[in-house]
Amino acid sequence: MSFYTSSSSQKTHNLNTRQSPDPDSSPASSPGAITPTTSHTETAGSSYFSNLLWGGLFRRFTSEPSPSLSTENSPPTLRHAHTYQPDGEDDGRNLGKSVDGIYTPPHFHHRVPSPMGLPQLEPLQLLGFSARTRTESRLLTPAIAEEVRNLVPTRLSIVDEWNLVYSLDQDGSSLATLYDKCDRYRGKRVGFVLAVRDTEGGIFGAYLSDVPHIAPNYFGTGECFLWRASVQAPLPPPPSLIDSEDTPDVGRSTTIRAEQNVASGQVNAHSIRFKAFPYSGVNEYYMLCGQQFLSVGAGDGRFGLWLDSGLEKGVSSTCQTFGNEPLSDEGEKFGVLGVELWVIGA
């Protein structure tokens, strides 16, 4: 055929090299069959065309996978999906390996606390007493101060020097003087410890989160708390150790001398019973200061600790702010013998 020879010389060349039939021969036919008479070149060209067509279609369908088969037989996968070992032993190196089973988070080693404990705090130093102040007139002792120190905020508990701001014995009996001496600490992140002594010798007070100052409303934070400290006398010796052959057991009394002078304030830390009353969360009546009074804690018309302007009388009742018991053994009302105010972190 002239079509194949004129359009593609290369195909004609391949055809001539692949098939070279004898020009004098004709294809065999069965008896009785009608055989068309065609030339050998036309027969070879049509055979090559059919082989080329069917061969191309066969290669196309066998080389490219069917989209419908691949999507139906295989589940969808994410290229960046991560799967873990179901036994929890995946250490991060088996990411991308899909497994069957319930997902279990990878196992990590638990952190072990350091055997090294916190460093011990330095002993407190109470600074500010004048040389003329007698030892028995000092209210806050190192033993009581250490108990209060355990409850103040951490940023202040590491401070090992407390400074005396006001002392009734050194500065006189005046609440206005106390306010004046506190003005220099306005705007600073400091804390205050208030200590009071009643006429029976009881020591109690409060921790103040803010500077005491005259204000129309309550102020302060939940860091405030009330406290009281009482000296515990040692137990008397048993009767078997007392040589009293002629003394009857009924009505016996024993006087025990303390190991140290309690009036001087120098007592053993183990002989002090310290009790604190932290913030209860009921209300926010932490501090309220006026010209005629200073109070800490309130609720239902009662004050946890209240002092008058002359620092001569005080009141201590159960209040909702701290849920405390009365701080003075004298009752809700007591007389004042001493007042001290200490600053921490100045």
Curated annotation (Swiss-Prot):
One of its GO terms (biological process) is response to oxidative stress. Residues 1-19, 64-76 have a biased composition (Polar residues). Residues 20-31 have a biased composition (Low complexity). Its main location: mitochondrion. It is found in: Mitochondrion. Keywords: Mitochondrion. The keyword Manganese does not apply. It comes from the Eukaryota. GO terms for cellular component: mitochondrion; nucleus. Residues 138-345 form the TLDc domain. It holds the Pfam family TLD. The keyword Mitochondrion applies. Residues 1-42, 64-108 are annotated as: Disordered. Belongs to the OXR1 family. May be involved in protection from oxidative damage. This is Oxidation resistance protein 1. It comes from Podospora anserina.
